[in-house]
Amino acid sequence: MDAIKKKMQAMKLEKDNAMDRADTLEQQNKEANNRAEKSEEEVHNLQKRMQQLENDLDQVQESLLKANIQLVEKDKALSNAEGEVAALNRRIQLLEEDLERSEERLNTATTKLAEASQAADESERMRKVLENRSLSDEERMDALENQLKEARFLAEEADRKYDEVARKLAMVEADLERAEERAETGESKIVELEEELRVVGNNLKSLEVSEEKANQREEAYKEQIKTLTNKLKAAEARAEFAERSVQKLQKEVDRLEDELVNEKEKYKSITDELDQTFSELSGY
């Protein structure tokens, strides 16, 4: 009986121990289940986080691809803008060279115009000298004509007296000799006056030819002055056009430089965004 009691006590003790172990195991099981649930929740959260990160990564990669495409396009636009700026600089240089050549031609034309004006003044002075000389020659010719008239009058008077002496030849030989001497003197003077008149006529013709040549040179100088004036106006017009073109090109260069600065700022902003995105991805 005692053995049975001891055995029952032992079995009860063993039962209690088993119950304690069962409670302990049940508690451990609950804790394990809780840990498993937490782990599953954490795994689920991690999976969701991973999916979100994958989605974010896809979006970032897509944004990066777009940014790279935009960057390539911006680089192309920048290269094109730099090419246009270089072309504009070349055009500006050519225009400046053309402007310098125009200024040189303008200075040359101005110098030639001054020389032509001086030559025209000299021609005007020569023309006035020739006019004065022509007036002097006309006065001299008038004097010679008066002398010629006087000589003719003397010749006629001599002839008349010669006829009178001839009629009185038989009566007064002395008067005849004096009349003949006077007649011979008058004829010699007539010959001298005729010779002088011929020389004056030749001089007058030469003077007329010289005056005609002077008039022709004056017309040529006037035409040359007119041509140089037209060239001067054309050079001034080209210079003014070149100056307006340079101002217009300078405005275009300023506009392109502003666009270039804006594009560089946009490029820097995109680069900063990419660096920030890479930093965030590296943090995860």
From Swiss-Prot:
Keyword Cell membrane carried by entry: no
Consequence of substituting V191S: Nearly complete loss of allergenicity
Domain of life the protein comes from: Eukaryota
Chain intervals for the UniProt region annotation (IgE-binding): 43-57, 85-105, 133-153, 187-202, 247-284, 249-260, 266-281
Recorded consequence of changing R255D: Nearly complete loss of allergenicity
InterPro entries (UniProt xref): Tropomyosin
GO BP annotation list: regulation of muscle contraction
Effect of L95V: Nearly complete loss of allergenicity
Consequence of changing E145D: Nearly complete loss of allergenicity
Cross-referenced Gene3D superfamilies: 1.20.5.170, 1.20.5.340
Keyword Hydrolase attached: no
Keyword line: Allergen, Coiled coil, IgE-binding protein, Muscle protein, Repeat
Coiled coil regions, renumbered to chain: 1-273
GO terms for MF: IgE binding; protein homodimerization activity
Residue numbers spanned by region Disordered: 1-51
Record field: compositional bias (Basic and acidic residues): 12-45
Complexes and interactors: Homodimer.
Miscellaneous comment text of the record: Constructed epitope mutant has significantly reduced allergenic potency, and hence could represent a candidate vaccine for treatment of shrimp food allergy.
Entry remark concerning the domains of this protein: The molecule is in a coiled coil structure that is formed by 2 polypeptide chains. The sequence exhibits a prominent seven-residues periodicity.
Protein family per UniProt: Belongs to the tropomyosin family.
Function: Tropomyosin, in association with the troponin complex, plays a central role in the calcium dependent regulation of muscle contraction.
Name used for this protein in its record: Tropomyosin Pen a 1.0102
Originating organism: Penaeus aztecus
